[in-house]
Amino acid sequence: GLHYGDIFLGNIGGGDHYQHSVMGDIVNTASRIEGLNKHLGTRLLVSAEVIDRLGGLLSRELGGFRLKGKTSAIVVHELVSRLGEADGKQRDGCAVFAEALAAFRKRSWDEAAEKFRACMEYLPGDEPSSFYMKICERHKTDPPDETWDGVVAMDAK
């Protein structure tokens, strides 16, 4: 997982044992983003802060997540392809996923689930779509309260 921000970098220790290391909330958040890969079935996730600084890449927003141990949400993207190498199915799949995510945020569970299913026609076996389809099914029977902000809370790393 990739995130952007200030870190502390240096040597820690004393005597005969020093360890070169990085510290800071950015490092912890990047680690949490990395852990999100196993839940979403993805390989490379990055924060919106990274996307804002990159060019020439096709990415898709996978939504807002409140990562374990964090109080504020972070928007996460999947890096899909270099723009020049992206095929029509990848582009169309990303567009349909964006529509599905918008419906999800509006609490339109049936519409969102239908669009996530449609996304899988462009991106067969798309695990982020499956992840959200399960949440849509759960929210249809047990909807979140009125304070829900469209963010997925992750209880595990």
Please state what every model-predicted region is.
Residues 7-9, 36-111, 117-119, 123-145:
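Cytosolic regulatory/linker segments at or just downstream of nucleotide-handling modules
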Residues 18, 67, 148:
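Short clusters of hydrophobic/aromatic residues that line enzyme substrate/ligand-binding pockets
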Residues 20, 29-32, 41, 130, ...:
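A generic signature of intrinsically disordered, low-complexity regions enriched in glycine/proline
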Residues 8-34:
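Catalytic-core segments of nucleotide cyclases and related cyclic-nucleotide turnover enzymes
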